[in-house]
């Protein structure tokens, strides 16, 4: 059964979902119907520690659904260190795909913050897009949050 928990943070409401002990999604926004679990409370604690600058890397079991290439891209994103960025082109070159495809896969990321698609920017240094509620402004806020820690 899917468990759901929404909670407020200094960067907005976050809703997390899990099946058993695997994280299904992290999204921005609030969901009315909730049925939390001890695992979701652990996830919430890690997210709050990340937002406060006390956690640089998450340690959670993720339930990731997608093609092999999508999973490779999301895995590569998790290797980008806290406070650092990579370009869509750098990731595309490493995985032998196109920067546009990397951007599309970032837009399909259902584990925002945990799989840090906000750390991927354009080659010219501009931010590109962000699928989270709040869009590019939230992406900029997340990057600034990490750089200021």
Model-assigned labels for residue ranges:
Residues 1-100, 145-149:
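Basic nucleic-acid-binding alpha-helical/helix-turn surface characteristic of O6-alkylguanine DNA
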Residues 126-149:
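…primarily DNA-binding HTH/wHTH and HhH modules…
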Residues 109:
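The DNA-recognition helices of helix-turn-helix-type DNA-binding domains
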Residues 113-123:
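Short Lys/Arg-enriched helix C-cap and helix-to-coil transition segments
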Residues 106:
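DNA major-groove recognition helix of helix-turn-helix
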Residues 59-65, 121-122, 128-131:
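Generic, ordered loop/turn and secondary-structure boundary motif
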Residues 77, 117-118, 142:
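Structural signal for hydrophobic
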């Amino acid at each position: 059964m899917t468990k759901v928990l929404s909670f407020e943070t200094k960067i907005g409401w976050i809703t997390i979902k899990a099946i058993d002990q695997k994280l299904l999604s992290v999204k921005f926004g609030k969901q009315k119907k909730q049925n939390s679990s001890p695992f979701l409370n652990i996830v919430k604690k890690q997210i709050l520690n990340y937002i406060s600058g006390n956690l640089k890397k998450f340690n959670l079991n993720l339930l990731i659904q997608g093609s092999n290439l999508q999973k490779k891209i999301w895995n590569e994103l998790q290797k980008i260190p806290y406070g650092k960025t990579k370009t869509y082109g750098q990731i595309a070159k490493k995985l032998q795909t196109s920067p546009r495809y990397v951007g599309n896969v970032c837009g399909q990321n259902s584990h925002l913050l945990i799989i840090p698609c906000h750390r991927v920017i354009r080659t010219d240094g501009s931010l590109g897009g962000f699928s989270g509620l709040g869009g590019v402004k939230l992406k900029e806020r997340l990057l600034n949050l990490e750089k200021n820690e």
